[in-house]
Design a protein with these regions (language model features):
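N-terminal loops that bind phosphate or other acidic moieties
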Residues: 2-134
Length: 134
C-alpha cells in the first residue's frame, strides 16, 4: 500500500508542473497526470481519472492535486471519490509547485502516513510557499 498522486488541471498546466517537479525532485513512481483539454467534456475527464487510478495498486490511497476548487477536474475527482467510498481519496486544490514538492517529500518521509495526514501537511506547506517580495 502507498499513495498514488494524480496531478489534474485545465489544459496542460498539470503536465508542466509535473515536469518541473521532476526537475527538482527526480522522477517519481505512482504519479499520473490528468489534463482537461478544450475539446473535451466531463465524461472524457471522468475517463481520464479512471484510467489514471487504474495505474495504481488497488490498495493504494489516492491524492489528487487539482488546479481549481469547483473546476471540472475537481468536480470529476469528487465524483469518483463519492462513487468509491471504500477507497481513500483526498483532493487538494490550488495546485502549485511547492504543493507538489511537499507531496513527494511527505510520501518519501513517512511510508505509513495516511492520505489524510499527507494532505494536511501539504496544505500547510503550500500556503507557506505563497510569498511576496515588496
Amino acid at each position: 500500500m502507498g499513495i498514488g498522486i494524480i496531478i489534474a488541471s485545465h489544459g496542460k498546466f498539470a503536465e508542466g508542473i509535473h515536469q518541473s517537479g521532476s526537475m527538482i525532485f527526480g522522477d517519481q513512481e505512482k504519479v499520473q497526470v490528468v489534463t482537461f483539454m478544450p475539446s473535451e467534456g466531463p465524461d472524457d475527464l471522468y475517463a481520464h481519472f479512471n484510467n489514471a487510478i487504474a495505474q495504481f495498486d488497488v490498495d493504494d490511497e489516492i491524492l489528487v492535486l487539482a488546479d481549481l476548487w469547483s473546476g471540472s477536474p475537481f468536480n470529476q475527482a469528487s465524483r469518483i471519490a463519492r462513487e468509491n467510498p471504500d477507497r481513500k481519496i483526498a483532493i487538494i486544490t490550488g495546485l502549485n509547485l511547492p504543493m507538489l514538492i511537499q507531496a513527494y517529500t511527505e510520501r518519501m518521509m513517512d511510508a505509513n502516513a495516511t492520505v489524510e495526514q499527507v494532505a494536511a501537511n501539504i496544505i500547510k506547506e503550500a500556503k507557506g510557499g505563497i510569498k511576496a517580495l515588496p
